[in-house]
Amino acid sequence: MVPSVFRFWGAQPGWDAAWPWLLGILVAAYLLGSIPFGLLVSKFMGLGDVRKIGSGNIGATNVLRTGSKKAALLTLLLDGGKGAVAVLVARYLYGDTAAQVAGLGAFLGHIFPLYLGFKGGKGVATFLGILLAIHPLTGLAACLTWLATALVFRISSLAALMAAISAPLWLWVFGLNTTTGLGLLLAALIWLRHSANIKRIVSGTEPKIGRS
């Protein structure tokens, strides 16, 4: 039987015989998601090891703290791209359920990367890439939520938290009920990964965008 969580995501009875394929998709997407583009970009551009800069995170916000907007933008696009590619390829080959499994795998790969001892990023860019691939309007709405929050408060982590928590709502608004479960799960993981940031936001000590 297909577990109830996947039935909620939209799996059909025919998938009962396809679990080896779903597991393979999950693993392949995880390995793709594990590629630490922030670290690779910063080293390739001669900016050093981004893990030794600022927050030590491998995401675009911390790459920006190297002073290179180009490196930060490239990291953002690549981290988002790996989530989108995983979803699009899986959907093309096996359909919507496989696409959601691939999105989960890519996200887990980014936050728990095999290549860095399972110490990765916070998953925001990858999450947005996954949303854009699953449903472009939902992804765009979440991106605009991030942008609006960032412009008003100038705090990247707060913008990420608002974008994450808005995603399941946008999925529901656009009628993607079978994908809302995935959105809730990934949003919850993003909030957990930002626990230290949340404490700093509450205390008023969270750095502004472009500052260390």
Protein language model regions, located:
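Short, strongly hydrophobic alpha-helical membrane anchors
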Residues: 1-20
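Hydrophobic alpha-helical transmembrane segments
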Residues: 19, 23-27, 72-73, 99-104, ...
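N-terminal signal-anchor transmembrane alpha helix
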Residues: 20-46
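Transmembrane alpha-helical segments that form the membrane-embedded catalytic/substrate-channel core
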Residues: 31-38, 103-114, 190-197
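Cytosolic, membrane-interface loops and tails of multi-pass inner-membrane proteins
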Residues: 39-71, 195-212
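Short, non-helical or kinked segments that cap or interrupt transmembrane helices
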Residues: 48-60, 116-128, 155-163
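Interfacial segments of multi-pass membrane proteins
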Residues: 64-67, 90-94, 105, 109, ...
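Multi-pass membrane catalytic core of lipid/isoprenoid biosynthesis enzymes
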Residues: 65-91, 102
